[in-house]
């Protein structure tokens, strides 16, 4: 993070978004929000149960970020009421990539790596590691279904570590033999594939909640001033900030 203070989450977000827009110079920015998904928890009640965050101040700041983006930035905010953010992003990527657009996902979530297996015109940038992600030379969903995903509370096949998964994912014959030795392995694998594979919901595009934001830099300045983000609204810094987002108008 960039700072500590009353609104560190808000500060980090708005301080971090400008260099990303400047770096990639997009024609359009989608700001995708989480819905109220159910189908994966119906498959596995433990799914993402380890991600509960009861920090009231964090959630208040998250709501502030969403409000500020909608009111002040020329971004397209998208949300489906019943879908995970990941699936909504995957759906938007599919739609645009199939239209011939180049898409860049800004995320540290490795679930998106599977999209690199599908779309040549999709790229992923990890803002934490500050690097582009290389396309896997194997089926990422198969590998992750074997290993599991601790971040989403998805247990892997017992005894299957990185080395075993690396061998199995590259050999259908070895994978078939591996499952024959213990049918429980295949049951865990198939469950995990259903939990990990991002779903194409392009048939639900009409159900997406979409907000086409309009830039309001005067209001944004006042908000940042009220939050005492003085380093962001100094004249030189502020002019650079505004000019970055003017490219999206």
Identify the residue ranges that each predicted region occupies.
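Domain-level signal for Mg2+-assisted phosphodiester chemistry and nucleotide/NA-binding surfaces
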Residues: 1-68
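Extended two-metal-dependent nuclease catalytic cores across DNA- and RNA-processing enzymes
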Residues: 50-232, 248
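Short, amphipathic C-terminal "tail helix"
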Residues: 238-249
